[in-house]
């Protein structure tokens, strides 16, 4: 055969076991930084997402490195999808938010059709998505973010849900994988109580 599967044994502890060793804040921050950087590097550079963000898929190694386990669930990301995702998140961060760029990114992602013009997008869809956008961008609004303080994922009102369903046309195949992995990352960082430098080349 031209392909041979190999395995490598990694020393280290899973998250809960590692936390029982009472790592200091610097160690928690370092581990959180590695998790954060790995997610964005995989998404925007490798275009290949480890789509199962279960804590058991990470090892905290004695030398401070992060071990990634179990690549049985990965998802390939299209370069155009990643570019549109980067544009959307970046547009949210501008002060004020760049609604025109957000509208275009929503179209590029296939979330809305050509019939939803920018004015209706801003007046009807964006208010329904505002809480979700605010939650998503919060870590990127400061240079170092304390994930221990990150709020729970917002639950939209029934009216906002109706508005979103009325205007959202379809869901890109890759988006649920990215959202699930991002939510998993946030939960890991919150459990760690990590303070992370969130500046990166893709969301700015």
List the predicted regions and their residue ranges:
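Helix-rich C-lobe and terminal helical cap/extension of kinase-like folds
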Residues: 1, 10-34, 61-204
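Conserved hydrophobic/aromatic residues on the N-lobe beta-strands of protein kinase domains
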Residues: 5-6
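Short amphipathic alpha-helical surface micro-motifs
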Residues: 41, 50, 157-160
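Hydrophobic residue at the +6 position relative to the catalytic HRD Asp in the kinase catalytic loop
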Residues: 56-60
């Amino acid at each position: 055969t031209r392909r041979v599967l190999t395995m490598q044994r990694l020393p280290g502890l899973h998250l809960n076991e590692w936390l029982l060793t009472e790592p200091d804040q610097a160690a928690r921050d370092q581990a959180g930084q590695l998790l954060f950087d790995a997610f964005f590097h995989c998404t925007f550079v490798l275009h290949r997402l480890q789509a199962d963000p279960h804590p058991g898929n990470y090892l905290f190694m004695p030398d401070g490195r992060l071990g990634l386990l179990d690549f049985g669930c990965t998802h390939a990301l299209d370069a155009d999808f990643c570019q549109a995702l980067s544009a959307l998140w970046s547009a949210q961060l501008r002060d004020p938010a760049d609604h025109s760029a957000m509208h275009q990114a929503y179209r590029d992602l296939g979330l809305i059709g050509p019939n939803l013009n920018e004015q209706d997008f801003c007046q009807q869809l964006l208010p329904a998505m505002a809480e979700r956008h605010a939650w998503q961008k919060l870590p990127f609004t400061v240079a170092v973010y304390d994930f221990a303080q990150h709020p729970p994922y917002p639950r939209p009102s029934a009216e906002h849900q109706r508005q979103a369903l009325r205007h959202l046309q379809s869901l890109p195949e890759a988006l649920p994988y990215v959202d699930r992995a991002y939510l998993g990352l946030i939960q890991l960082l919150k459990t760690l109580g990590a303070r992370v430098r969130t500046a990166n080349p893709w969301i700015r």
